[in-house]
Design a protein with these regions (language model features):
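Extracellular carbohydrate-recognition regions
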Residues: 24-117, 254-280, 565-623
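Aromatic- and acidic-residue-enriched carbohydrate-binding clefts of CAZyme catalytic domains
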Residues: 42, 73-140, 283-321, 348-364, ...
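Extra-cytoplasmic beta-strand recognition segments
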Residues: 61-68, 103, 155-185, 212-219, ...
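Extended acidic/polar, glycine-enriched regions
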Residues: 148-269
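Extracellular glycan-recognition regions
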Residues: 571-746
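Carbohydrate-binding surface patches
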Residues: 749-786, 792, 835-836
């Protein structure tokens, strides 16, 4: 049986077809917004072993035996690491965040000891005479006896296996101390699966009563992703071992303490204009003392204390502030440094500082970071340290973000204290605020700064929000610092990538206000996933980019200089009505009460419902004085009404907030389990705004319609009315309309056009997010000539497929040269595709 083969997705039609197809008009004489030359950058955070065990080239895991050290300011209580008991900056509740902490397992992370013809014990303890005060722990080997030919072997398997290459050289460095060990030491690299030795070096016995550094170069004779490093001891005695490092000489640009070249090249392939570092949630820390302290990331890696970070493992900070700045310089991108604003992550502990002394110290920390990158070594202490590290010239630091994902009035106070001082002293730095571009609190913060909204959502959100920025306030430039389609798309399939492409076209169209963007997260070690989707996957010796990687790459490689008029930027398909379902009541980290609940259906019948008719799905519910009360501090509490189901009705009640951080949740169109449907979030987002949100699999998704400012007071009864129809939902409170939202239209086809001045080319970008071929004609105006031949770059395929180590480019763009263009042409786009057409055009 012969397979039918489609040779090309671009098919040109005769002029009689043109007459029947609605034309998309493009006018090159009508110039739109300039496209920001800095629109595409990268964001690096230590998550999913992006750095340690990833971009940072060190092969030894837990090299300083510090993995078990508690996060700063936390204490060990009954098998858990427990945070300080301090008010949360967002809602003033003492959260005392904690996490399971297996102390003994963490001590030996990455290590194992074998006694072969010997009797020995290995213990990680705080050394009596530490190698360095910043890293007080070491491995103690008590070797009681060794038979002839016997040995004690201390082995590190790296981060799920070391990547070794035949012919490559590896710098070995470790420290040993002993009062009574009189034998030699052998260092060996081998394959943990086969046992094959790929290189070794023998160190003769020497006096090691003081900490003694051992160094050598190991030449690998084999290639494996299952490499390991062993230190072999041949005599009895008590031996202390610390800071064991195996570092490939083949790093990006050959830099000492450098980066894994294949992963660095993947970043270069994105053509980034800037890099954001070091985060992310780890900038905030799970507690304030757990934040990233950039000064502790400088100097000899042996002296860097490291820190357990918010994603569940300890970072060595081998890739520190200096290495970040150096990498930016090496590939010609600007540096964006993110520093703590005096508060920890609000969804963890959320503790914060507020005294003048503490806030002045926060400002000084920003100063010192900027001076390290920019300052004059002759006059500045921190610039001198940069010069001493081998870089007397300034680094390309251009942006500084004050905090990460901080919100609410306390952040406003902090920003208003920090920003004016720094902006006055460093007027050429572009400072970034962490609030979203529509946050009403921006009105309380004067100044010329950027804002940084983030979105992690499902494909529908990104398809439906191509026009998100069309009516965005132009008061502050926008940096979309984190975004990704990460819900319901596996580890990142083509559907996710195509939806992101639609969102990118909207940001590009609005580049007069959206100046910068960066996908997040960047990396994932295949052995640890801390976030649902990540742009680049890798293991010890392989890497590949997801389909989203190629969307980013295509977009960055094919930027126009400026946008030009296009008559149609999107095509709306059918409206998806609000579903028939039950209603529900609830809250988010808030205590509240509901009473006098009644529903009037479309036929005019009104039914009142008692508190005991509600099914309590999440939270702690009880009846108090005839009201249904929710008393817990849980998120997304819910009590539904199984007796009701409908899609056209008016829901009325009285609601009162009695405590907590936000307002009310009213659910409609919900399924029986309370997992899918819609919600009215009243006084949400830290009790600042109200909006409608879809619910998917028990999680709220992004807002439909428009958020409006609203604050809910404590101990006040509100009259609440929600009018629901299949096409529209409207919220009234105390007799006044607050906001409304239409049922979402499924928009899946998009077009964006621009002109590349340097190349003299019209750039047409089209997204087809449907599983059907999309055929359109184009009518090009405003150009003297439009070439018949052009370049087509297209990404398409099965929406559910993903790239993998076995098929790393299963989903990757294909570039072809095609004829049949000109001032009028028609073509068809493949199902589920992102296509860029470049045509020479003279103006």
């Amino acid at each position: 049986m012969k397979k039918k083969v489609v040779s090309s997705f671009l098919v040109f039609y005769a002029m009689n077809v043109l007459a029947q197809t609605p034309a998309i008009k493009v006018d090159l004489s009508q110039k739109g917004a300039d496209v920001s030359p800095n629109l595409f950058g990268i964001f690096f955070e230590e998550i999913s072993h992006a750095g340690d065990g990833g971009l940072y080239a060190e092969l030894v895991e837990n090299r300083g035996f510090e993995e078990h050290v508690l996060p700063s300011s936390m204490t060990y209580v009954d098998g858990r690491a427990v945070a300080v008991d301090s008010p949360n900056y967002e809602h003033r509740v003492n959260r005392r965040w904690s996490i399971d902490w297996n102390m003994e397992r963490k001590k030996y992370q990455g290590w194992k000891m074998q006694a072969k013809g010997a009797v020995a014990k290995a213990t990680v303890v705080e050394a009596e005479l530490p190698l360095h005060e910043n890293t007080p722990n070491a491995m103690r080997l008590d070797i009681m006896s060794v038979e002839k030919g016997g040995k004690v072997v201390l082995t590190n398997t790296g981060y799920w296996g070391m990547g070794l290459k035949s012919g490559a050289k590896y710098d070995l460095r470790f420290y040993v101390r002993s009062d009574n060990y009189k034998g030699g030491i052998t260092a060996r690299i081998s394959d943990s699966k086969t046992g094959s030795t790929y290189g070794y070096v023998e160190f003769k016995k020497r006096k090691i009563k003081e900490w003694t550094e051992y160094t050598a170069v190991l030449n690998s004779t084999g290639t494996t992703g299952n490499g390991q490093l062993s230190l072999e001891f041949e005599a009895k005695g008590t031996v202390w071992v610390d800071y064991v490092s195996l570092f490939p000489q083949d790093t990006f640009k050959g830099r000492k303490n450098g980066l894994r070249p294949d992963l660095a090249e993947m970043l270069i392939g994105l053509h980034p204009k800037f890099m954001r570092w070091p985060g992310g949630c780890i900038v905030e820390g799970v507690t304030y003392e757990n934040r990233v302290k950039w000064k502790e990331t400088l100097g000899d890696p042996m002296t860097r204390r490291g820190e357990w970070d918010a994603w569940g493992y300890r970072s060595t900070w081998g890739m520190g502030y200096h290495e970040f700045l150096q990498f930016c310089e090496d590939i010609g991108m600007d540096a964006m440094f993110v520093n703590n604003a005096g508060m920890s992550c609000s969804v963890r502990n959320g503790d914060f500082v507020s005294s003048k002394e503490d806030m002045d110290a926060v400002i000084q920390d920003f100063r010192d970071a900027i001076d390290y990158a920019w300052g004059d070594p002759a006059t500045n202490e921190w610039a001198k340290k940069r010069a001493e590290a081998g870089h007397p010239e300034p680094f390309p630091l251009k942006y500084v973000e004050i905090g990460n994902e901080n919100v609410g009035p306390e952040y406003v106070k902090h920003f208003n204290y920090i920003y004016p001082v720094l902006k006055k002293e460093y007027p050429n730095i572009i400072f970034i605020n962490t609030l979203g571009h529509t946050d009403p609190l921006l009105a309380q913060i004067p100044g010329d700064y950027m804002v940084d909204p983030h979105w992690y959502r499902d494909p529908n959100f990104f398809f439906n929000n191509n026009h998100l920025f069309d009516e965005a306030p132009r008061t502050h430039d926008i940096y979309v610092g984190e975004y990704a389609c990460n819900t319901g798309v596996g580890a990142g399939n083509l559907l996710a990538a195509i939806s992101e492409a639609a969102f990118i076209l909207g940001m590009e169209r609005n580049s007069d206000v959206v100046k910068m963007t960066s996908y997040a997260p960047l990396f994932e070690n295949e052995n640890r996933r801390d976030w649902p989707t990540n742009l680049i996957h890798f293991n010890s010796n392989q890497t590949f980019g997801r389909a989203s990687y190629y969307v980013q790459q295509m977009s960055a490689e094919n930027q126009a200089t400026y946008n030009v008029f296009v008559s149609e930027t999107s095509t709306s398909l059918e409206v998806t009505p609000f579903p028939a379902g039950t209603i529900g009541l609830g809250s988010y980290s808030t205590q509240c009460q509901y009473k006098n609940v009644k529903i009037t259906t479309a036929d005019g019948k009104t039914v009142a419902y008692e508190p005991d008719q509600f099914q309590k799905l999440r939270g702690e519910w009880k009846v108090e004085g005839g009201a249904l009360a929710q008393t817990s501090n849980e998120n997304l509490t819910m009590a539904t009404l199984p007796a009701f189901k409908g899609d056209s009705y008016t829901l009325e009640m009285q609601a009162m907030k009695t405590g907590g951080m936000e307002g009310f949740f009213i659910y409609y169109g919900m399924d029986e389990r309370g997992r899918n449907g819609y919600s009215v979030n009243i006084g949400g987002w830290a009790n600042q705004t109200t909006g409608f949100q879809p619910m998917q699999r028990g999680r709220t998704m992004d807002v439909i319609g428009r958020q409006v400012p609203q604050r809910i007071e404590n101990n006040k009864w509100y009259d609440v009315k929600v009018v629901v129809t299949p096409e529209l939902v409207t919220l009234y409170m105390d007799g006044k309309e607050i906001t409304k939202a239409k049922a979402p239209a499924q928009t899946r086809q998009f077009c964006q056009t621009g002109y590349d001045v340097e190349k003299g080319e019209l750039v047409i970008k089209v997204v087809n997010g449907t599983e059907k071929t999309y055929t359109r004609s184009f009518d090009i105006k405003g150009a003297k000539t439009v070439a018949q031949q052009g370049t087509v770059i297209a990404l398409s395929g099965n929406p559910l497929e993903e790239n993998s180590f076995e098929e790393p480019k299963k989903l990757a763009p294909k570039t072809t040269q095609s004829n049949g263009f000109g001032k009028q042409f028609s073509y068809e786009f493949a199902p589920m595709s992102y296509t860029i057409i470049r045509i020479k055009a003279t103006l």
